[in-house]
Amino acid sequence: MLAEKTRSIIKATVPVLEQQGTVITRTFYKNMLTEHTELLNIFNRTNQKVGAQPNALATTVLAAAKNIDDLSVLMDHVKQIGHKHRALQIKPEHYPIVGEYLLKAIKEVLGDAATPEIINAWGEAYQAIADIFITVEKKMYEEALWPGWKPFDITAKEYVASDIVEFTVKPKFGSGIELESLPITPGQYITVNTHPIRQENQYDALRHYSLCSASTKNGLRFAVKMEAARENFPAGLVSEYLHKDAKVGDEIKLSAPAGDFAINKELIHQNEVPLVLLSSGVGVTPLLAMLEEQVKCNPNRPIYWIQSSYDEKTQAFKKHVDELLAECANVDKIIVHTDTEPLINAAFLKEKSPAHADVYTCGSLAFMQAMIGHLKELEHRDDMIHYEPFGPKMSTVQV
């Protein structure tokens, strides 16, 4: 436990963090990645450019400051971030570097207002927070299905929508990975380690991709959406490489499956609480794995499948979804094409899905923020709203 004086100083900085938090974290990333270019092999530079990662870190720092008297209340958030850290192979030796540049950024942004007393207090607080993460992540490393990065062969590559490719991969001979014995949880993701020779890239590029199925019978399957170029931003570095360059027979490195986005096993065998699977675009991927699990365990449970995409061509996994839903005894299938229909809103959800359902939703950060807001507006219980955004999850959290 931090000293009371230290905690008081930290809490006194909450107002300035609310105003300047993102400025501090942008400064932190700029300085750290300029002076420690080796970390560009880990950090997603797109998330830096669009502000998602600085926003997420600012939210995390603010949450820590507000809860400095009892950091245990943040444990769910710590575990979510810890899964990403383990998947990216972030290690204890990285934490002192982060701490050094975070304190420097606070000093740079706040200037004379960042007194030695404040900097010392945040130094102590950061170490306490880092120790929590290191402890949580140590257990995750111990429980990982395999250590580090392992080589896999791409055995299949298939378009499941006009802009989404499903990859099937198998571990290379001698990797020590036995597919048949891997206990995959529906909703988990794998992390790929690539080195695209595009866009003047000099570094490894790591990305998380949700698994399409918990079944490992024919290999691990994950889906990748082509992130097209848009104003001020080039095409997605890794998605472009995987869509255009990676081919069957190529080798790709993966870290072990990670993530805590998982269907509630206590509800999977009952029929009173319906299941709502609400997705947008490639966000359908982890929900497809959950649908498979639900159908396998109990096809009689009421299911509401709500899938949004721009048009029919970008609607992923149509055939597989229809095959699974055909096995269900009580299902509502709702497809939304936003080129001709309005975006999903609270009124839509109120009409199309029951208020007492267990809801799982996945999509872009903007989609997730909207869906969480709509569900809360409709007074869905927080513990019945489960979500996985494609981007830093703390960007969707209000503290």
Swiss-Prot record:
Residue positions of the active site = Y95, E137
What other facts are recorded? Present with 13000 molecules/cell in log phase SD medium.
Q: What is this protein called?
A: Flavohemoprotein
Q: Which residues form the Globin domain?
A: 1-138
What function does this protein fulfil?
Is involved in NO detoxification in an aerobic process, termed nitric oxide dioxygenase (NOD) reaction that utilizes O(2) and NAD(P)H to convert NO to nitrate, which protects the fungus from various noxious nitrogen compounds. Therefore, plays a central role in the inducible response to nitrosative stress.
The upper taxonomy is:
Eukaryota, Fungi, Dikarya, Ascomycota, Saccharomycotina
Cell compartments where the protein resides: Cytoplasm
Q: What is an example of a GO molecular function annotated in this UniProt entry? A: nitric oxide reductase activity
A biological process (GO) of this protein is: cellular response to misfolded protein
Catalyzed reaction equations: 2 nitric oxide + NADPH + 2 O2 = 2 nitrate + NADP(+) + H(+); 2 nitric oxide + NADH + 2 O2 = 2 nitrate + NAD(+) + H(+)
